[in-house]
């Protein structure tokens, strides 16, 4: 996503009849993503190279939008455990008014500069709710849900935020660009995890090991800019997956016949919370191990004391190396997390396939894969084909994401027993 679409173009699609439609949820999520992209000022292709926003709370704004909509809808159409211990609301309240108000209030809190556009389009959406009493009751529920979501998942003041310091020999030059990870990266209160380091993987293989030599050679051979071992399709996939777009699959899931709005809001909220914690855990591990990227290792291959590795002082990766430590792979942890959540939502091999697009290739077509595990394997391999990750790092990252997602699915926002549910009419 490059830049912010005019708010009217985005939010006009939010007008829906009661009860709230899948499009209401999807479009507000999409709108939140566009606001975040515009606020960060980064294009889709350079997000791994551009520092994160200085306002730490913005990094979790999208999750709070989804969480607020979930709590507002779940208060009316009670099907799940509340994450925020949010009380039940009026069964006759407008679900549209509740969901739209919840999203609007969260976005207004985090993006006050967009107040005029947000207010204008919020009013348009609310006008579609014809019953004044139901609209007002829904509005009040949405406002309360937004306040609850805004207050959750913030920075923990008890955690020290220590700026990154390059490790080097005194007097020796190192690159001066600091990693994209800000000091607040590991200072959030986790949504799911006990602590940021609770799923930290073991260390990368010893530089003198056979595993190191094998994975080093694989990325050297396949991931070089001028590699002759990589096929044209593999080159395309390495670039295609720099910034994957999962919205095609999420929309297919949301549009499935018989799904209630609260189910879709829960899907987006759970996904956001899992990805936030996965990102935090992956960042914590990266900063802990501070492991070198292939471009550094391969150019200095003689320094690892492994006779099975060959140095190539002129080696360059196919794609730009992200500006943070290598181990574990963040793309792979995200892929593992998404696969676990979506398998729970639509099955391991959804009838419509796993549909993904790309924001790193202009006008990218939607790719359809048979299963979520196929998609994870493709993402993992793409990072080696791009010359930025080793296979062992891909595997470690995937396991982080899967662990976080499984913890979430087993512990939060679970379906209520039928006797405790109160479904909206």
Residue ranges and their predicted role:
Residues 17-19:
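N-terminal signal peptide c-region/cleavage motif recognized by signal peptidases
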């Amino acid at each position: 996503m490059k830049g912010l679409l005019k708010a009217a173009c985005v939010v006009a699609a939010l007008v829906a009849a009661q009860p709230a439609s899948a499009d209401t949820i999807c479009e507000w999520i999409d709108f939140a993503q566009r606001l975040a992209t515009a606020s960060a000022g980064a294009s889709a292709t350079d997000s791994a190279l551009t520092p994160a926003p200085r306002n730490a709370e913005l990094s979790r704004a999208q999750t709070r939008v989804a969480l607020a909509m979930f709590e507002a809808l779940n208060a009316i159409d009670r099907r799940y455990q509340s994450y925020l211990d949010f009380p039940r609301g009026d069964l006759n309240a407008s679900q549209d008014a509740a969901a739209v108000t919840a999203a609007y209030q969260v976005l207004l809190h985090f993006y006050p500069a967009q107040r005029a556009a947000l207010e204008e389009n919020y009013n348009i959406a609310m006008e579609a709710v014809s019953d004044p009493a139901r609209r007002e009751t829904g509005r009040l529920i949405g406002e309360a849900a937004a306040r609850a979501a805004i207050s959750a998942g913030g920075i923990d003041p008890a955690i020290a935020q220590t700026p990154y310091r390059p490790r080097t020999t005194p007097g020796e030059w190192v690159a001066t660009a600091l990693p994209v990870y800000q000091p607040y990266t590991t200072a959030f209160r986790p949504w799911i995890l006990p602590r940021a380091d609770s799923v930290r993987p073991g260390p990368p293989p010893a530089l003198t090991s056979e595993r190191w030599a094998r994975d080093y050679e694989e990325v050297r051979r396949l991931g070089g800019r001028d590699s002759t071992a990589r096929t044209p399709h593999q080159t395309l996939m390495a670039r295609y997956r720099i910034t994957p777009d999962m919205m095609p699959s999420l929309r297919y899931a949301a549009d499935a016949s018989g799904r209630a709005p609260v189910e879709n809001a829960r899907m987006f909220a759970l996904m956001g919370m899992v990805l936030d914690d996965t990102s935090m855990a992956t960042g914590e591990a990266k900063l802990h191990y501070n492991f070198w990227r292939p471009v550094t290792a391969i150019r200095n291959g003689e320094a690892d004391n492994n006779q099975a590795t060959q140095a190539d002082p002129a080696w360059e990766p196919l794609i730009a190396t992200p500006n943070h430590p290598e181990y574990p792979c963040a793309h792979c942890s995200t892929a593992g997390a998404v696969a676990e959540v979506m398998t729970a939502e639509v099955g391991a091999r959804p009838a419509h396939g796993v549909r993904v697009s790309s924001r790193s290739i202009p006008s990218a077509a939607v790719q359809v894969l048979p299963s979520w595990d196929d998609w994870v394997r493709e993402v993992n391999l793409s990072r080696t084909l791009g010359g930025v990750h080793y296979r062992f790092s891909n595997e470690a990252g995937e396991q982080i994401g899967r662990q976080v997602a499984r913890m979430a699915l087993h512990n939060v926002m679970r379906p209520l027993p039928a006797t405790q549910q109160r479904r909206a009419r």
